């Protein structure tokens, strides 16, 4: 068997970083799910898309019922507000609350600390190139991003 190629490395990377904690994994897992809901609503809003339950489901790759529960939990936690869509009053859409923006600010700070820790010892140039390579892959895949 030959050494793994770059495609295999890419998919190992994706598998590793797409792991989700088990549903019953307690408070840290629930916090992560609430951040995921807030991130999805934020990304949709940045792109000018309505953050409906169906749009959130598509954004994070889960079914509609799972997205509905996720959005409801984030709203109950105070991170999202749910209201009628401006485009279609029959639809409900989510928006970030001030608590949701604070949650995202804290999550983004944590993400930067994790990146700093994982790339410790790398030159600033290597870090920027890696960031650009990840961004390029997202754009080439056709995946939406904020």
Whereabouts are the PLM-identified features?
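Short, locally clustered residues in the helix-turn-helix/winged-helix DNA-binding domain
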Residues: 39-46, 108, 135
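N-terminal leader segment of winged-helix/HTH proteins
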Residues: 1-35, 39
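Key DNA-contact positions within bacterial/archaeal DNA-binding proteins
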Residues: 65
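The alpha-helix within a helix-turn-helix
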Residues: 57
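Helix-turn-helix DNA-binding elements, focusing on the entry/boundary residues of the two helices
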Residues: 52-53, 71
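C-terminal regulatory/oligomerization modules of transcriptional regulators
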Residues: 1, 128-146
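Charged, amphipathic alpha-helical coiled-coil/dimerization segments
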Residues: 72-128
């Amino acid at each position: 068997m030959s050494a793994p190629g770059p495609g295999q490395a890419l998919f190992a990377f994706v598998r590793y970083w797409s792991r989700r904690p088990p549903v019953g994994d307690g408070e840290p897992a629930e916090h992560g799910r609430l951040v995921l809901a807030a991130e999805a609503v934020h990304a949709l809003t940045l792109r000018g898309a309505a953050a409906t339950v169906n749009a959130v489901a598509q954004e994070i790759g889960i079914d509609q019922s799972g997205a509905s529960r996720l959005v409801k939990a984030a709203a109950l936690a105070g991170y999202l507000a749910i209201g009628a869509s401006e485009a279609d009053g029959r639809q409900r859409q989510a928006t970030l609350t001030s608590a949701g923006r604070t949650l995202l600010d804290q999550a983004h700070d944590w993400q930067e600390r994790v990146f700093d820790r994982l790339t410790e010892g790398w030159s600033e140039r290597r870090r920027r190139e890696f960031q650009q390579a990840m961004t390029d892959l997202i754009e080439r895949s056709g995946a939406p991003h904020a």
